[in-house]
Swiss-Prot record:
Native source organism of the sequence: Lawsonia intracellularis (strain PHE/MN1-00)
GO cellular component: cytosol
Annotated region described as G5, given as residue ranges: 174-176
Its job: GTP hydrolase that promotes the GTP-dependent binding of aminoacyl-tRNA to the A-site of ribosomes during protein biosynthesis.
Coiled coil: none
Name recorded for this polypeptide: Elongation factor Tu
Entries under CDD domains matching the protein: EF_Tu, EFTU_II, EFTU_III
NCBIfam families: EF-Tu, PRK00049.1, PRK12735.1, PRK12736.1, small_GTP
Amino acid sequence: MAKEKFTRNKPHVNVGTIGHIDHGKTTLTAAITKVASMKMGGKFVGYDEIDKAPEEKERGITIATAHVEYETPKRHYAHVDCPGHADYIKNMITGAAQMDGAIIVVAATDGPMPQTREHILLARQVGVPYLVVFMNKCDMVDDPELLELVELEIRELLSTYGYPGDDVPVIRGSALKALNSDSADSDDAKPILELLDACDSYIPDPQRDIDKPFLMPIEDVFSISGRGTVVTGRVERGVIKVGEEIEIVGIKPTIKTTCTGVEMFRKLLDQGEAGDNIGVLLRSVKRDEVERGQVLSALKSITPHRKFKAEVYVLSKEEGGRHTPFFSGYRPQFYCRTTDVTGVITLNEGVEMVMPGDNATFNVELIYPIAMEQGLRFAIREGGRTVGAGVVTEIVE
């Protein structure tokens, strides 16, 4: 049968495997590519190729990540798998690989383990909206009651961390048997097809950036004589049309204004959309009323805040981070979108200090408010070098 030409006419969804070490995440990833390639065409990626994933730099942090892709009749999936536990933590906190949903792999022989818990908690904190469970190594458990027990334990754990434990799909199978199967219709491959089916039906199509409310971090401000003030930047999400009312948010009190022009590469446009680098002409705003670090946004879509909670990964010495720990009262810069803002860190009660290479929960108070929402990513810098990366998990005030 001739292979079909790959066309982007299907919805695209980003997923990844998470879970405890040696529970079979990488084997499952390889098995999915094999079964999907037998069923739909596409490339089979073997275990070794995924396991020796190249290291990538994301905001100065070294993360080893394997990227594979596969298709179902309904969708095109991009899937990330990380070789090491630390890589997962870095990946989820930096958002290097944004996930619309994750497949949590739990070995039926062990049940949920410490990293299973940690990954579910992190997924919750950083806003991975949907989880699907693959109970692996089920061929190694003879007692059906034991399988029931493990499934119950997983569901309870998911509920503890705020996922709908009763509704989450749980698929049982053996990733290794599926990887060694030679037909997509075999009994060994069936759980993989069930898993893909569960992803198709349980993880909804993600909302595209262009459909979200307009937001553009301001990078530069110009004054054009006779025309007014122009701010430039890359549109993060949504669409801006000429004539629309918008707000300038952060640093100073929020100002309401109107977009009187959009230009890109010196050409005038009717609108700018997610991904575009544009200049926006603002009605009756003076040059000194707006600055880099503020955002341009749809009315009432984002608000300025100073206090928040965050989940943070602190770079190790080898990654160019600090050589020494820090304590409550530490005052670094928080680099959010286009600007550095000084903030004071308070650690949780009972946490004495944070070592390089750790991840921790920070309570932060910035010296002035910036446009902020749950899920905002930031870097922590000290004298211009990155010493950490984090994500806002809760807005306090």
